[in-house]
Amino acid sequence: MHFATLASGSSGNSVLVGEGDRNFLIDCGITAKRLLANLRMLNVSPSKIEGIIITHEHSDHIRGVGVLARKLKIPVYATAPLWQEIDPILGELDESQKIVIEDFARLAGLDIKLVPTSHDCRASYGLKVFGLKHTLGIA
């Protein structure tokens, strides 16, 4: 399993996680343009991004989600309470791109467990990602 922090801090957050050449993003709180530039620096093709999973609705975690999902034609994964908050913010997405998850998801061949966390928002989650040989926790 591999991961890379693409952005961190109050100006935006995003993490790339993957196994082999399959990848997904945790959040996209930076512009799609900046995120794509960061992927290029890592030699990761945007075509290898299979989706975006959202941890919570703050703008520094979702700022670029809508544009990136439309541009790459990839799904966005979020819990029902999160979709209620982010749907009006993300802009027009095809219904097939809006994936509602509960406490578990499978993305880019990896199993992902959502763990509720305490934060100053309606719904917030940490993630436990299970790879072939390693497990990654992100909160």
Model-derived segments and their meaning:
Residues M1-L42, Y125-A139:
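Conserved beta-strand hairpin/beta-sheet module of binuclear metal-dependent hydrolase folds
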Residues S10, P46, G64-K71, E92-K98, ...:
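Noncatalytic linker/hinge segments flanking ATPase motor cores
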Residues A80-K133:
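Metallo-beta-lactamase
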Residues L25-C28, L39-R40, P46-I49, I74-Y77, ...:
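Short, surface-exposed linear patches
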Residues A4-V15, H56-H61, V76, W83, ...:
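Structured catalytic core of nucleotide-sugar glycosyltransferases
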